[in-house]
Each structure stands twice: as structure tokens, then as C-alpha cells.
């Protein structure tokens, strides 16, 4: 993820200017539904009526699209896992590489050690108990906060900033704000194609419109 380099260079520049503490917006997307995959999840209902086999065929065809073309890359990513349903489909939004590709990177010893284990198993085990009591978006946000935010975003942000001697603080992860965001209905987090709607509305009188 090239975002780690962004954090490093921003922190490095701040340090050169004598700034030792920065504020990060990490958590905003994870709490208030701001990622593209949240919008993709919303659009999913419009083609879930298709038979699974047809969706799988569309997935195979879109995998042939050029990754160098931004639109084709997004289209391919959107339909990645189209042949899946339920938890498997939800967890697939967080996949960065297909199992077939990963197998080419692993040694035979490591593959034997893995056995029947899969990288997504912890996510599946985490989300299974709450499937019946939470909406798909709520399930996805739970995965964001438990895995993507904690294991990825906060991880590289801390390592890259501290490598330059700068501390990064995350006001969005104030425990009271996190708990409050969990009580906000989905309709205020997503409105049409607009993510983080309630957050943007709350701040529109304090920030320039282009921000």
C-alpha cells in the first residue's frame, strides 16, 4: 500500500519543520462508511438477483480487463468475487490477492504448514456470530475496525511516523466517538453515492466546501 510512503514523507517534512505531533483522519472512513467498497456493497443489491453462475461468468470476463486502465481496474475489482454470496462475498472485499496467486509465492513447506487454513479465516470467524443481528454494512464496518484499521492503517501509520520521530494521534478513535458512531443508523452514513454523509454535514459549516 503506497499510503505508507505518504505517511513517511509527510512525517519527515513535519519533523524538518520542528513539528513533533500530527493529527490523523484515520478511522473516519471505517466508522462512517467512506471507502469505495462501502458504496460497492450498496450497489451489490442491484445485481444480486442474477443467478450465481451468471455473476461468476461476469467475474471471469472482467478479470481479463487491463489493470493499467483506471476505469477497467475499478470495474474488475468491483466484480471480483461476484460469484460469491453471504460472508464469503463480504470478506472478499478485503482481499488483496487471489489464493492462486498467493500459492505461487509460498514455499511447499509453508503450504503444507497452512493445511486447510486460509488468510480470511479470522475474519470469517469474527463476523459469523453477528450476521443475523447486523446489516451487511454494519458487518463490513465491524471488519474495518477489527482488522483493516487495526492491522493495516494504524500499523503503518505508527511505524512510518515514528521512524521519523513524529507522533500521530487519531481523534476519530476517541472511545466516546467510536461508540456514538456505532449507534448512528446506516441511512445517515450513506446517502446515495455519498459516504460519511453525517460527518460531512456536521462539518460543512466549519470547513471549506472543497474539503
What are these regions (language model features)?
Residues 1-165:
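Glycine-rich active-site loop/lid subdomains used to bind and stabilize high-energy intermediates
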Residues 10, 177, 198-199:
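Generic structural signal for hydrophobic residues
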Residues 208-211:
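Short, intrinsically disordered, charge-balanced linker/junction segments flanking boundaries
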Residues 178-182:
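Short, solvent-exposed hinge/capping segments at secondary-structure junctions
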Amino acid at each position: 500500500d503506497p499510503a505508507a510512503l505518504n505517511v513517511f514523507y509527510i512525517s519527515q517534512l513535519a519533523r524538518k519543520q520542528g513539528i513533533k505531533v500530527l493529527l490523523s483522519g484515520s478511522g473516519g472512513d471505517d466508522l462512517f462508511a467512506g471507502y469505495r467498497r462501502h458504496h460497492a456493497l450498496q450497489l451489490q443489491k442491484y445485481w444480486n438477483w442474477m443467478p450465481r453462475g451468471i455473476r461468476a461468468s461476469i467475474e471471469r470476463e472482467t478479470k481479463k480487463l487491463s489493470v493499467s486502465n483506471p476505469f477497467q481496474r475499478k470495474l474488475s475489482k468491483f466484480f471480483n468475487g461476484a460469484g460469491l454470496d453471504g460472508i464469503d462475498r463480504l470478506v472478499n472485499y478485503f482481499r488483496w490477492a487471489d489464493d492462486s496467486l498467493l500459492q505461487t509465492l509460498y514455499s511447499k513447506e509453508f503450504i503444507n504448514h497452512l493445511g486447510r487454513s486460509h488468510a480470511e479465516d479470522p475474519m470469517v470467524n469474527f463476523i459469523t456470530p453477528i450476521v443475523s443481528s447486523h446489516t451487511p454494512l454494519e458487518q463490513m464496518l465491524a471488519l474495518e475496525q477489527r482488522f483493516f484499521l487495526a492491522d493495516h492503517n494504524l500499523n503503518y501509520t505508527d511505524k512510518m511516523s515514528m521512524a521519523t520521530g513524529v507522533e500521530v494521534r487519531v481523534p476519530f478513535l476517541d472511545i466516546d466517538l467510536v461508540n456514538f458512531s456505532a449507534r448512528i443508523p446506516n441511512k445517515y452514513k450513506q446517502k446515495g453515492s455519498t459516504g460519511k454523509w453525517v460527518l460531512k454535514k456536521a462539518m460543512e459549516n466549519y470547513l471549506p466546501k472543497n474539503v
